[in-house]
Amino acid sequence: MTDGVILVFARAPEAGQAKTRLIPKLGPEGAAQLHSRLVHLTLDTATAFHNVSVQLWCSPDPHRSFFSQCRATYEVELHAQSGVDLGERMLNAFNQALTDYDWALLIGTDCPDLNIEDFEQAEQDLNNGIDVVLGPAADGGYYLIGLKRPEPNLFQNIPWGGSEVLSCTYTRLNEAGLTFSQLHEHHDIDRPEDLIRFPRLSDADVT
């Protein structure tokens, strides 16, 4: 058994399907291009973390040419997301990964400020006996969740995509008596106003 694995959840950057809340500002093609840049940035960071396997969990499926290119560039494993909602897809990924690894960190591709120090702190906390590590996002969600064993209650009946995801997750953690730690808060890119914080990632005039 290898020590740990990073699970990167990503959607194919298809115009009209990716970063839809940014389409009014960037247009379908521009939003898809930004999403592609975010996926590559995330994989750059994840694969730079020391001696940890990286799996790219793909939506709608891993057979898109974009994901094949990612596999060739980053030497990541490709997996298909499966489940009726985000929570079920995340839980299924953890269930599979934690049969082969001691711990797993699951991340999306919306957080440009995610860094190696976040991964190092999460790994340290899990190895020191913490049950769950969360990376809080400023919008009320989280950009990272780390586990040593699947915890179904953390992924069921959560209002995914809203501002209550993190608070609901903390409630579930407390109800289950799980120990948890929190990483530094970061901002996601989800809405046009978020682009102002990350001008290097978009050619759009956001001022």
Set out the residue ranges of the language-model regions.
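Short phosphate-binding loop-to-helix
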Residues: 68-103, 162-165
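Conserved donor-nucleotide/metal-binding helix-loop-beta segment in metal-dependent transferases, i.e.
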Residues: 114-139
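Short aromatic-hydrophobic micro-motifs that form the base-stacking/packing surface
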Residues: 105-107
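N-terminal nucleotide-binding beta1-loop-alpha1 segment
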Residues: 1-22
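Conserved alpha/beta core of the MobA/IspD/sugar-nucleotide pyrophosphorylase nucleotidyltransferase superfamily
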Residues: 163, 167-207
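Short acidic/His/Gly/Ser-rich catalytic and metal-binding motifs that mark active-site loops
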Residues: 14-20, 64-67, 142-144
